[in-house]
Structure formats: structure tokens, C-alpha cells
Amino acid sequence: MHHRMNEMNLSPVGMEQLTSSSVSNALPVSGSHLGLAASPTHSAIPAPGLPVAIPNLGPSLSSLPSALSLMLPMGIGDRGVMCGLPERNYTLPPPPYPHLESSYFRTILPGILSYLADRPPPQYIHPNSINVDGNTALSITNNPSALDPYQSNGNVGLEPGIVSIDSRSVNTHGAQSLHPSDGHEVALDTAITMENVSRVTSPISTDGMAEELTMDGVAGEHSQIPNGSRSHEPLSVDSVSNNLAADAVGHGGVIPMHGNGLELPVVMETDHIASRVNGMSDSALSDSIHTVAMSTNSVSVALSTSHNLASLESVSLHEVGLSLEPVAVSSITQEVAMGTGHVDVSSDSLSFVSPSLQMEDSNSNKENMATLFTIWCTLCDRAYPSDCPEHGPVTFVPDTPIESRARLSLPKQLVLRQSIVGAEVGVWTGETIPVRTCFGPLIGQQSHSMEVAEWTDKAVNHIWKIYHNGVLEFCIITTDENECNWMMFVRKARNREEQNLVAYPHDGKIFFCTSQDIPPENELLFYYSRDYAQQIGVPEHPDVHLCNCGKECNSYTEFKAHLTSHIHNHLPTQGHSGSHGPSHSKERKWKCSMCPQAFISPSKLHVHFMGHMGMKPHKCDFCSKAFSDPSNLRTHLKIHTGQKNYRCTLCDKSFTQKAHLESHMVIHTGEKNLKCDYCDKLFMRRQDLKQHVLIHTQERQIKCPKCDKLFLRTNHLKKHLNSHEGKRDYVCEKCTKAYLTKYHLTRHLKTCKGPTSSSSAPEEEEEDDSEEEDLADSVGTEDCRINSAVYSADESLSAHK
């Protein structure tokens, strides 16, 4: 009941008569009964049934239990009280009122109410005056009505042009309470004046904004608002020479300040004010104007918000003159104390510190305070922007450093030291590591980016390419110690003597395996396995810079220059290198010192030297195949693009290379013009000749377990074993002939015309030279040129013929 009555919006100034039959003959009473200042007497309470108006309680009584609930019957609050506002008119219930017979209600309470009736009503500013959706719950009219004259202990006139707002100028709504229970807000009974404070015009939209003016500790003399200043003017704060009423000290009150034609000088925090442009009305703002300290000659106002400061220009927030003028933003000085929450505003400087009580509800303000005050002195119980001036600096104890994942994952048998290959950190052995000891897998960041995959510097060892079926799948990047393990610190060997680890891929991962016993106090140095080196297009051995002549080169550039010197040593004399030199005569005068081959130009010889050294820098992007000659790469790319520019004039078959066309034309002529250099045997196809030459140049080391026949390659042995078992899995669908290999079946299909086919020779097949080597059958097998039957030995073929 008490709470409901305290929340009522009571009538404006002007004490109306109470209605009670039990006190109809009582004598007039006044505030002098209570020892208060004299006030006009009032008539006796009239007959029941008339309206009753209850005046507003002053701020000095806001903390006391409401006396109104004592004078009305129980339950009257539920039905209402007759007030001056139309929307709150109610009628008292019929008499009698037995509890009004006491002397308290006859004399004392009417005196209190009559005293309060003489005073101007308190003015309030409440943060809830504007709803979240931006609609004003309370508004100020364009022409607020004048206040009744009120003077206490002399008249103190305010300067012209200053207008205060009372409750009569407020169009209140029934749902809005003007009696909050918040004790931190103080009533303003007179106008507020400030001096030497610039005005601000803020671009912050008032849509969804609630402003709150909070006064703590108002002290001073009473002030009067002249009648001449009661016309509608913007509320200005220009001077603090006129002091506020002392009756408002330590009490709370709220003034609704919403509507058109209202101006306020404000001081804005630089870190928490953002420019608001049109179209932001849907967002909820909560900008509060806090007065954190008020004394006799100083008042401070701060606008705190969670937005950043932007350039402020004069803008109109409403159609009818609501605007804010520019303001100078003050800075924090060292004299400000956070604990007290006091602020001084003077003509020279303005200092602002928000009290901690107001900072608790704003995360952005908390962050701002953390940056403004870095040191908290526990002896002074306050914060300082630097060291305490009295007790000096504090002692900081840092955290224990946390090592990275790469360093923490290092095995106990290994240690990290400076590398001998020039790197900052390398991995060294603390004890003997036996041969065939594996480490891994290598852990790093996986990347599928083509930019990383096509890293041009293949010498760096922090990019590891992973292939699947000859196609680049992803890369492992070992640059971040927190994302990798200790294997990122293992460095690459510079030559064969330094290498003691072999890096190889397995199941999409990289492992290191020792190639020898590694004694203590030795650094682990790796190089790639032979197969992996071929995949990534690097030399098969780390001593790639060691020339065949015995020259050691520290870099590839030096090694390339050294190879050029070998080429110049084979150049012809000046008399033979004129305009009609080898480029025109096509004479192969540039011979390789490592093999019998000769070339028509030094550039061709240079490329040939790179092949001897295992250097294939030109790599295919489609199948990861590498070439030492860029022209070979261009020719190889035609296989992927399907470009065939060389066409046979007899059968309209097309080829990607001219050499393939020439080899194909032999099928139509039947000529065998390819002769072996070691014997007089002739061949129609170049691939057959190359396969034959291997018999003379390479030693067969792979032996058949059934017939002791030797082979050059394992796949040749597998094909040979099928002949022992009688397996001919590749059958022609036209003539039902079977073959040991798919290669021979493919050759047969090119000439097969059915069961009565009797083509003389198989047709040429277009294949890359290196691929044809893999498809070719073992050297010991021969096929019949008459019916394409395959035989494992020359003797069997002769018997067949």
C-alpha cells in the first residue's frame, strides 16, 4: 500500500482541501504546528464526497513513510484518489472514516500538507523518461508555464534568459512515475547555472536515448526564477555564481527533460562518444548526464556513452529546435581521484573522473578506466596513471615463460643448439642414435593453396609437398613453433658426408629415418629419399653442387657458372664459329664430356649437363613430372591439353610430336631404319631400339626364381612370371587372342581386324618416352609380326615362324 501511494503522480502546486466529515469543524492549521516556516492557513475540510487533491511531497520527505497512506482508508489506493489531473480523478468512498478522528489528522497532518503546498514542486530528470523504442513518455511543452513566486530568506534573482521546468509544464502519462526509489538522484528546486562551459551540438540521435542528470551534494542559497524569464527558452547553464537550494542536499529527485526546444551544455568523455547519423533510431542508446560533485561554486556534468568520439557539428535533432552546441572535451588530470568521484569545473580547466558506482554498469567504461589508471596503490587505496608519488613503484612478478609446442615435443635424447649449417637452431644428439631409427611424423600447418604449393625456392626446408598418385595433394608448412613439432628444427644436409637422416613420405606424412649410427654431440641433418626427390624436382643427392671434375660449389649459381666453363671448353675455334657456324651447318660440335652425345648449340649442351646432375627444374603442373629442358615440358603439356598438330596423310591420325609422326609413317612403309649402335639389329620404332640398347649398356641384376633369367626392372620380372604361370589376362575382344601385358594388347588392337586379321605389323602408339619404358615388356620377350603372338624368347619366336 505504501509503495503504491508513493508511486502516484500527485497534483501540481496548490493545496486543495481535504474531504472528511469527521474533521469538518476543525480549526485551520498551518505548518507552524510543526515548527516549520509560516504558511497560509487553509479552510476546514469540507463535506465528504468532494474531490481530494494530495500535494507532492518535497525531497526532504522522500525517505519517510508516506503519511498519505495513514489518512486514507485501507484499500483506497486500489481505487484511487481525486487528483488535479483528469486521467487520475477518483471519488472517495462514503463516510465515516473512524481513523481520522485522532488529533494527528485534525491538526498535525494538515499543517504538514499546508506547508508543502506553499513550496514550488521539485523538478526531476529521470532516465526512464524515454522508452526504449524512442517514444517519449514525458515531454516538455514549447511554452512551459511560469512558476508561482516563492522566496525564502530573501530573494536571489537569476540572470535573464534562464528558465526552469516545473511539473506543471510536463504532460505526464499515467504509466510514468515521478517518484523513483533511487537514492542517488537529487531533486532540483531551482534552475541550474554554470559558467565558462562551452556548448555542444552533438550528432547523436535522440531516438531511443535517455538522458539523466544526477546531482550529488547540492549546497548553497535559495534561488528564485524571475517571472520575466518564464517564457520558453532553451535551458542554459552559464554560471555557477547562483547557488542551489540547501534543502536539496543529500536527497533525490528526477526532472523529466524530454521534448522540443531543450538545450544542455555537456562535457563528453573522449573515449565513449560516437557520431550518430540519421537512421540509427532503432538502436537503443543510454546516455546519462551525471553530476558527480556539486559544491558552492562548482558543478560538473558528464555525458557517458558506449560510443566513440567523432567530430561534432551543429545538427538539429527535432523539427522544433532541439539542438546541442559544440563543447570542448576535457582531459583527465593527475589531480583527479577515482575513489571520491569528485570533479572540478572552472574557467581554466575541467577534470572528470566517473565514480566507480557509475562505471560498474558499462563494460566500455571499465575498459577505458583500465587504460587511464594503470597502477593501484593498496596503501593509498586509489589509482594512479603512473607510479604512486608517495610509495613509489610497485614490484611486478612476471609469469613463467611457456615454451612452444615445437620445443616441448623434443625427445629427451635430443637437444637444441645452434646449427652448423647457418641456421639459428638445430637438433643435436645427446646420446647415440642407432641406424634405422625413425622420427615422426612431421607436424605442421596444412595448406592447399596453389601459391604455397608452387613455392619457387625449393632449397628451403619449411615447405613439404605431399603427393598422392603423382598429384600434389597439399603442403605442410613448418614456420610456426606453436603449430609444429620439434622436427621443424632439423636442418638439411649440404653434402653426403653431413647427411645422417633420410626424409621420406608415407601415407601423407613425413618421417625421418637415420641412415647411420649417430654418436652424441652430432647434429641431425636430413636429405630427401630418391623417390621423394624426384617427386619434388630436386637432385637425388645433397652433393648436387659437386661437379664430375671434382669441383665443389657452395651454391647453385656457382655450380651453373662452372658448368658453363665446361661448355666453353668444348666450343669450336673462332674460324668455325662465324656467321656460317654450327647453327647453320647443324653440325654437333658441342660434345658432352660425360657421355658420347654432341649438340648443335652450347645451350643444348648446358641443358644436357643438368640432366646428368639430376636437375629437373621445369615441372608439370598437372602430373608433377619434371624436365631439365623447358622445350620438353612444353611438348609434354600437349598431352594434357590434347593438342595434336601433326597429322598422318595416309590414315588421318594425329600426333603431338613430329617424331611420333615420323615413327608412325614407318608402319605404312614397313621399313626398319633404326639400327642398334652395338649390333646390326634394325627396328622400326624408336622405343624398341631404346629397349634393345639396355641389353648392351645395363647389367641385369633382377633374377627370375624359376628360370634364372635376369631382368633390368621388377615389373619386367612380374610380367615374366606370368609367362611361367600361363597367365594371359589381356584378351582381344575381336580375335580372342590373349597377351601378357596391356601394352601388347593395345598394340594388337591397333591392327586387329577380326578373327582373320593378318596385319603385318602393329601400329605406332603415341606415348612419352619415359612412359613407354614403363609399359614395355621385358627385353627377353618378342612378339610375332605376323599374328601379334607374344613369345618369351627368341628361340620360341623362331620356332613359331
From Swiss-Prot:
Residues 762-776 have a biased composition (Acidic residues). Its EC number is 2.1.1.-. Residues 412-529 form the SET domain. It is found in: Nucleus. Expressed in many tissues. Highly expressed in ovary, testis, pancreas, brain, heart and prostate. Its main location: nucleus. One of its GO terms (biological process) is methylation. Keywords: DNA-binding, Metal-binding, Methyltransferase, Nucleus, Repeat, S-adenosyl-L-methionine, Transcription, Transcription regulation, Transferase, Zinc, Zinc-finger. GO terms for molecular function: DNA-binding transcription activator activity, RNA polymerase II-specific; DNA-binding transcription factor activity, RNA polymerase II-specific; histone methyltransferase binding; methyltransferase activity; RNA polymerase II cis-regulatory region sequence-specific DNA binding; sequence-specific double-stranded DNA binding; zinc ion binding. It comes from the Eukaryota. PROSITE patterns: SET (PS50280), ZINC_FINGER_C2H2_1 (PS00028), ZINC_FINGER_C2H2_2 (PS50157). InterPro entries: PRDM4 (IPR017124), PRDM4_PR/SET (IPR044404), PRDM4_Znf (IPR041493), SET_dom (IPR001214), SET_dom_sf (IPR046341), Zinc_finger (IPR050331), Znf_C2H2_sf (IPR036236), Znf_C2H2_type (IPR013087). May function as a transcription factor involved in cell differentiation. Belongs to the class V-like SAM-binding methyltransferase superfamily. This is PR domain zinc finger protein 4. It comes from Homo sapiens. The lineage of its organism: Eukaryota, Metazoa, Chordata, Craniata, Vertebrata. The gene is PRDM4.
